[in-house]
Amino acid sequence: MSRRKQTNPNKVHWDQVFAGLEEQARQAMMKTDFPGDLGSQRQAIQQLRDQDSSSSDSEGDEEETTQDEVSSHTSEEDGGVVKVEKELETAEAPVSSGDALAEREVTENLNSDPLLQLCQCPLCQLDCGSREQLIAHVYQHTAAVVSAKSYMCPVCGRALSSPGSLGRHLLIHSEDQRSNCAVCGARFTSHATFNSEKLPQVLNMESVPQVHSEGPSSAEGKDIACSPPVYPAGILLVCNNCAAYRKLLETQTPSVRKWALRRQNEPLEVRLQRLERERTAKKSRRDNETPEEREVRRMRDREAKRLQRMQETDEQRARRLQRDREAMRLKRANETPEKRQARLIREREAKRLKRRLEKMDMMLRAQFGQDPSAMAALAAEMNFFQLPVSGVELDSQLLGKMAFEEQNNSSLH
């Protein structure tokens, strides 16, 4: 099935937004621009009043126009006349002092300039210097609305699935393909030199220590603007060699750091005593657990062990296999004949399962090999099959095989 690109419902079309803002600014400029002096404007107002009175006295010949249209036209004309009269009265009003006039003109220009309103936040009325700053500022408001599993780009509005994807995507929008560390301000050019941290809350910038990272990118961090960084959906881009971020984490989580340092510096005797206490507590918990809790714990332990083995290196895997071989050798040396017989039966069943898996499709065999639950289900299914011989005959065969192996071992020694 082909995977088509889905439309993003959270994407904001900034071209349409800015086009609408420019149209509103143009209309505002046309309304405030009145040609001619005050006398010509008074004549225009008088003509509008004469036309209004003549239209009310005379009966119109056009019967197609409805009463609603006429009332709407007259209300628009009356509103325009009243607005122009108010502006003329404010223009003719005397001003007491020149300082008050200058201050009033400055405030009116700032409030009525449509170009400045193009970069004004529609939510908090904050004046931004450019469109890019306005877009980033607007997404500061929308970051709380975005769900925890979506990572919104503050430039184009694209929703990404992970913090790393957002960090790589943010490098595309920068002109020099660079970005800045949110803590120390150092610049980096590749996603291999920074971490994308998703924080539960926005960091308090007053608690950030003024420490610059020591590395090849610290020299480029001098030309960074002093504006506070933007946190889209709680994402921080932090460079790997950021000493300020490490120091900030130490100051924010002192209890965890002290606990780790105490574990690291504890003596050997104290460590052995602690491990013995933990083993005793674990054994007492397992003795008192129900069968359902035991099954859940075993499944959880198997899953954790599987995930740990998927992430281990070749050296760790070699050490683990060596430990398993040593433990198996010691266990077989101390087992009783009954336990040995049960182990041989289990090994025989495992071989039968393996031979059956070899006859299956390669894809299914790989799936069964990676899924422990599927392997357990197949083993449970195999238990329903009857063995080729009875239990008594199987026991006699196994005992004879054990005696034969013991004779071979004694002859070799």
Curated annotation (Swiss-Prot):
Main location group: nucleus
Under the heading InterPro entries, the entry gives:
Znf_C2H2_sf (IPR036236), Znf_C2H2_type (IPR013087)
So which domain of life are we looking at? Eukaryota
Task: Write the record's keywords in alphabetical order, separated by commas.
Answer: Coiled coil, DNA-binding, Metal-binding, Nucleus, Repeat, Transcription, Transcription regulation, Zinc, Zinc-finger
A GO molecular function annotation here is:
zinc ion binding
Zn-finger segments (C2H2-type): 117-141, 151-173
Q: Which regions form coiled coils?
A: 260-367
Biased composition, class Acidic residues, residue ranges: 58-67
Subcellular location field: Nucleus
* Annotated region (Disordered), positions in chain: 26-83, 279-320
Q: Which GO terms describe its cellular component?
A: nucleus
The protein's job, in short, is: May be involved in transcriptional regulation.
Q: Which family does it belong to?
A: Belongs to the krueppel C2H2-type zinc-finger protein family.
Name listed for the protein in its UniProt record? Zinc finger protein 821
Q: Give the species this sequence originates from.
A: Mus musculus
